[in-house]
Amino acid sequence: MGSMSKDQFLPLRCLLKSLIFAFLFIFPVRFMNPFNLLPSSPCQSSDQKTLDMILEKTGDYCERVKNMALFYVCKEKVEDERYFHRKKTLLNFSLSSSEGPKPRRTRKKSYTYDYQLVKKGKELKEKRILLEEDGTEKHEENVEFRPVKYFGKYVVYGPVGFLSKYWQQHFKYEIAGRDVVDGKKAVIIQSTPKTEREENCNYGRVWVDEKDFSILRIEYDPRSIKNYEDELLLSPIGDLRKIVNWTVTYGFEKNGVRFPSQQLVQELYVNNEGQKVLMEKISLNYEGYKFFIVEVEVKY
């Protein structure tokens, strides 16, 4: 092979100089700044911005709900089903079984109320007329809500205790996922109290409409539910722990405000494999809404 002269390397040297010049000139900031060598987390930053925006918008929504003058009536249909199991049957619940044990007895109760809520200024009242009990017609005015183990008052204001501007300072929030509720895209927000308290002790997860930031659903954390007592049944083949699932769905909309369509409470025992035994189911369905006032109160 013949020898190469120095002149033959000139084109290669020129090319290398051009590439080095272009590299340093086009990317000077990124590679000359040592902090750019550290890994970035764009997803985390993006999620925090999204969360901050959601909290601002839902705070505005809750202020609207809180300051609304309301007067409406609807039908409130309550079904309470209690399933009684022998303790021995529960403790021998097979981990390999595809179905839970059958109850030895079932008790069913049902009530239909004419429900009325009136809110004017700071005055808030709810009234019930019992129309039916276990299939028998009734007409009892100003009755107390028939005893069920778990129920909430003033459910339309549930979002306020989670996301109003005042209560936001008492919670820590994070985006827990995304979902679809009744065909509407939603962001799931997990709320956790900064400190334990007696007032407004509930916390859990909230489904927020991506479009208008109204509240589509609330799921209460069992540990925040009053009358809930943690219980553990010990078994040689696996322990059973009692849990309570409580969700409120806001399926009716009027003047930009959402009203409850259903409350569903389920008390269950769950084994180590995630298999469930239903002990009690309470469903409250709201229908036939009639609105007389839904307006923002003007404050001077």
Where would I find each of the regions flagged by the language model?
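Compositionally biased regions
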Residues: M4-K6, L19, S41-P42, S46
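Structured extracytoplasmic
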Residues: L38-Y203, E210-L216, D221-V244, F252-Y300
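Bacterial N-terminal signal peptides
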Residues: S18-N33
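Intrinsically disordered, low-complexity polyampholyte segments enriched for Lys and acidic residues
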Residues: K6-D7, K17, N33-N36
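N-terminal secretory signal peptides that target proteins for export/translocation
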Residues: M1-C14
